[in-house]
């Protein structure tokens, strides 16, 4: 699939440095550049996700990692921290009625989806280590409602429920239902 071209060069030379780039991006993140940083991170993550779905079978990559021997970069603590920071920055800008509301809503949904995927992959990679798995599971359980509830506030209940469904997290889904019903009563 990769051949001798620029794709192979990228995967051999640049990809090993992705975590360093993400760490540097996180260090530079502030309110003035959050939208641009989010665009960059989402382009990278969505491109990688598309590549995995299109070519994963060729490289015998499972859709979700299942062994601790291979922890994908997108499931690293560095990537998860950056996704959460971008999510918080985007949510904050939405709360302050930023001029680019439509883009921010789209970004918030995409960041929630990518963060949930990263948490899921992180949890799957720790199955052989009970202590690490318990920590990853607890972090994921804590993050799910924090990533999904804000989607209700921006009128994206459809995305919140769609993202919650695959995780079989009944508690969060009930919270979403109750919060959504409460918002409807307020109207």
For the regions a language model picked out, list residue spans one by one.
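Extended alpha-helical solenoid scaffolds
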Residues: 1-187
């Amino acid at each position: 699939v990769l051949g001798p071209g620029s794709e192979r060069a990228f995967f051999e030379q640049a990809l090993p440095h992705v975590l360093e780039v993400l760490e540097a991006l996180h260090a530079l993140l502030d309110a003035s550049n959050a939208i641009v940083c989010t665009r960059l991170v989402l382009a990278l993550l969505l491109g990688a996700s598309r590549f995995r779905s299109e070519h994963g079978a060729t490289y015998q990559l499972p859709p979700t990692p299942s062994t601790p021997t291979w922890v994908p970069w997108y499931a690293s603590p560095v990537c998860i921290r950056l996704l959460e920071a971008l999510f918080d920055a985007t949510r904050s800008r939405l709360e302050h009625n930023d001029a680019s509301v439509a883009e921010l809503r789209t970004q918030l949904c995409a960041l929630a989806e990518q963060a949930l995927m990263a948490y899921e992959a992180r949890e799957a990679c720790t199955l052989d280590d009970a202590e690490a798995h318990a920590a990853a599971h607890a972090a994921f359980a804590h993050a799910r409602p924090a990533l999904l509830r804000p989607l209700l506030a921006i009128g994206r209940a459809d995305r919140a429920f769609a993202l919650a469904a695959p995780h079989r997290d009944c508690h969060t889904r009930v919270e979403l239902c109750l919060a959504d019903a409460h918002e409807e009563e307020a109207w």
